[in-house]
Design a protein with these regions (language model features):
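Short, intrinsically disordered or compositionally biased N-terminal tails of bacterial proteins
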Residues: 5, 179-180
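C-terminal nucleotide
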Residues: 1, 96-178
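Gly/Ser-rich oxyanion-binding loop with an adjacent helix/lid
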Residues: 3, 7-116
Length: 180
């Protein structure tokens, strides 16, 4: 699968005018496969950054590198993934992303210092694998639109946070599979 990941990124860069030639790259990681920390997106972005550096003189933006990753997931692997994981890996840090125009998402950094709040990010290997969740991932955009509709909007970006919070009980009642 990793070889295919590299081939499809190369194809995307060829389509953007890259004159690719041989290249030796060695990568090591101890991130468990399927651990849910976007390791696939990080690998896709790594390949994009390497190709961009070596063959495109860094002309491809971090946003475009993320979009290449999404395109490859959709086209070559048949995974209806969005752009969030690739964008977070490519742009880096904590960001907000507005997908009002999917071809040109608005990306803004969020300034936060977890240590000042006495917090730390810990990653644990739960042993769970999310590799077979394609249908669940594909359902997320429709579920978000359903929540927005309950809150009086078409998409969640149009719903003020206060309205969203105020409508949580209605969302749970109308949209939950299990009513409590």
């Amino acid at each position: 699968q990793r070889q295919m990941c590299i081939r499809d990124r190369c194809e995307a860069f060829r389509q953007r005018g890259a004159a690719l030639s041989g290249l030796d790259v060695y990568v090591a990681s101890n991130v468990p496969k399927g651990s849910g920390v976007s390791s696939s997106a990080a690998f896709e972005v790594l390949i994009g950054v390497i190709l961009n550096d070596r063959f495109m003189a860094e002309k491809v933006s971090p946003i475009a590198i993320a979009q290449i990753g999404q395109w490859a997931e959709n086209v070559y692997f048949g995974k209806p993934c969005g752009l969030m994981d690739q964008m977070a890996s490519s742009v880096g840090n904590i960001i907000t992303i507005d997908f009002a125009d999917p071809a040109h998402p608005d990306v803004e950094p969020v300034q936060v210092d977890f240590s000042q709040a006495g917090l730390a990010l810990c990653i644990l290997d739960s042993g769970a694998d999310h590799a077979d969740l394609t249908d669940e991932y594909a359902a997320i955009p429709n579920e978000c639109r359903a929540v927005a509709a309950v809150c009086g909007g078409e998409v969640l970006r149009d719903v003020p946070f206060e309205t969203f919070i105020a409508n949580l009980p209605a969302c749970r009642k109308q949209l939950s599979l299990i009513h409590i």
